């Protein structure tokens, strides 16, 4: 049906699904897919709504991962049209979630519809994992569904995450991996005192400074063929009472690693503690792992998606691991081949978020051709 993907995208954008509120988006998808033979399960945790819906029981299983939640709009007055009234203007669809990532969800659903109509006896299975908790804490969304699937022994063979990956034109970038994210909350202890009597105090900012300098100058690894070198950066420093005559009793630092597969979580932790200990600091350090790095080398899935992109757009996609974390990091625990592909990301999270209307239908064709290459060919 002409423009069916656009119509579905508009239906989803019209829902005010601010994290963790799905606002009925998943019900739209369940209703749409029921007629194709999909069996749907609500896997809700806390305030988060998750959907696992699958057609077929045989392998291979191709899964699409997406999120219906969106970030806040910012000042509505700065939008040229209401962010939850999907508006087509000058060849673009405007609205919060247009690019990130309701158009991708719509495109995959219509791709399935056309695929099943053309190939009703296809081999394998198709599934969607949709959450309303990707833009927020991401602790009761995809990760919880993955844990549930793991517990009952379900395995995903190929996974496409619908994140907006392209930069200049549709098809130019496939994400075939992401760096890991490891954060630290470091408190260095000192002795508070009068700044005129430093011999009666111990300034933790002064004692921590050499260690901070060493951490900032350390080469953690050299990266590899797929990833740049691991980086360490401070995001926040807090210390002192606000007075100019008081030596602080402690200083607090928040820092973050973005790390490649050339390093491990434990190796990074060990090296940080070694540096802090070598400088004789009295400290407390709390770690938080947001996600491990994952990588899908060239293979069946990346090749199939790349070929589909070339057929539809004529563009040769680049495989990239740049950018922040995504829900792909959770799927990688139960799927060895995970890639991310969606529309251009130039306007995501911005005022007047938009996606080119022509790209929405092209994206659906790319997804359908990818399904054909994965589920029709031996």
From Swiss-Prot:
Source species of the chain: Nitrosomonas eutropha (strain DSM 101675 / C91 / Nm57)
Binding site for Zn(2+) 1: 67, 100, 163
Positions of the catalytic residues: 69, 134
Protein name, as recorded: Succinyl-diaminopimelate desuccinylase
Entries under CDD domains matching the protein: M20_DapE_proteobac
GO MF annotation terms: acetylornithine deacetylase activity; cobalt ion binding; succinyl-diaminopimelate desuccinylase activity; zinc ion binding
Gene name in the database record: dapE
Keywords noted in UniProt: Amino-acid biosynthesis, Cobalt, Diaminopimelate biosynthesis, Hydrolase, Lysine biosynthesis, Metal-binding, Zinc
Assembly, per entry: Homodimer.
Binding site for Zn(2+) 2: 100, 135, 349
Cofactor(s), names only, from the UniProt record: Zn(2+); Co(2+)
CC cofactor note: Binds 2 Zn(2+) or Co(2+) ions per subunit.
Record keyword Iron present: no
